[in-house]
C-alpha cells in the first residue's frame, strides 16, 4: 500500500485564529516497505497526522489517497476528503483501517478486559480469519513481540506498560495490516525496554511491514530509520534522509533536536557505516557528518 497526503489541513476549533492549525497544508508520501521516523516536539502535529492516515480523523481541507491491491490483485485507489464529500465512501473506512494499523502511546486503551489470547484472536477473526486458525496466529504473534506463551492467559491488568504495548502490537498484527504507525512506542520505557521495542519494530520491517515511528526522541530512531519527517507547529519542515538533517547545525539547535548522548550517538553512526572520529562536542560531530555527506554527494 502507498499513502499520499495532499495539502492536509486540520482545525480542531474553527473559532481559533486561522494560523492555529493542528495540521497546516501537510503533503507527503508513505511508500511500501519504508521505515520512517516522524519527529517533533509534543503538540507539533505528529499524532493528528497519524489519525488522518488511519481515517480516525478526516481532513478539513486537502485529501488522503490510498493505493493498494485487492484480493484479486487488482489495483485500487481510495481518496478521503472533507466529510461532506466523503459520506458515500464511509463504508470503505474499514478497508483503510484493516490495511493501516496504529499502536498508540497509551496502549491499554486498545486492550479489552479479557485474556490476551482472546484479545489477539478478536483482531484476526474481525478480518475474516476462522477462529481455530486465529488461535494458532495468536500463539505465533505473541512470541514475535517478545513474550512467551504464558502471557496468552493473562489479562491486561497483569502487565507492565511495556508489555501492554507489545500486546497492542500483537493485536494489530493479527489483523495483518500493510502499514503500521507507532505513536511514541518507547515513551516511559527504560533503556532495555526501549531497545527491545525498537528491535521488535525492526523485525516487523524486515518481515515486509511498512513501519512509521512517531517520537520526539532523536536518539531512539537514528540507528533504525533512514527517512525522517520532522513536524513543527502542524507543518512538515523537513522530509528526507535522517542523517542529512544533521548537517544543519542551526536547524538542530532551533528545533531542539540535538542528541542527548554524544558517545552513544557516535557509536550508532559508526555501526551503520559512518566513519566518525573521536569528536569531543556536538558541533564537531555535526561538522564531521557534514563533510561525510558532502563527500558522498560529490561521489554520486
From Swiss-Prot:
Signal peptide (UniProt feature, chain positions) = none
Q: Which residues bind ATP?
A: 40-47
Q: Which keywords does the record carry?
A: ATP-binding, Cell membrane, Membrane, Nucleotide-binding, Translocase, Transport
Coiled-coil regions listed in the entry: none
Where in this chain does the record put each ABC transporter domain? 3-258
EC number(s) from the headed UniProt entry: 7.-.-.-
Asked if the Swiss-Prot or TrEMBL record annotates the protein with the keyword Membrane, the reply is: yes
Write down the top EC class of this protein. translocase
Keyword match Acetylation: no
Per the record, membrane topology reads: Peripheral membrane protein
Cellular localisation: Cell membrane
What is a single molecular function from GO for this protein? ATPase-coupled transmembrane transporter activity
Please provide one cellular component term from the Gene Ontology annotations of this protein: ATP-binding cassette (ABC) transporter complex
Q: Which PANTHER family match?
A: ENERGY-COUPLING FACTOR TRANSPORTER ATP-BINDING PROTEIN ECFA2, HEAVY METAL TRANSPORTER
Instruction: State what this protein does.
Output: ATP-binding (A) component of a common energy-coupling factor (ECF) ABC-transporter complex. Unlike classic ABC transporters this ECF transporter provides the energy necessary to transport a number of different substrates.
Subunit note: Forms a stable energy-coupling factor (ECF) transporter complex composed of 2 membrane-embedded substrate-binding proteins (S component), 2 ATP-binding proteins (A component) and 2 transmembrane proteins (T component).
Q: Which family does it belong to?
A: Belongs to the ABC transporter superfamily. Energy-coupling factor EcfA family.
**Protein name (Swiss-Prot/TrEMBL):** Energy-coupling factor transporter ATP-binding protein EcfA2
Which organism is the protein's source? Mesomycoplasma hyopneumoniae (strain 7448)
Q: What is the lineage of its organism?
A: Bacteria, Bacillati, Mycoplasmatota, Mycoplasmoidales, Metamycoplasmataceae
Name the gene behind this protein.
ecfA2
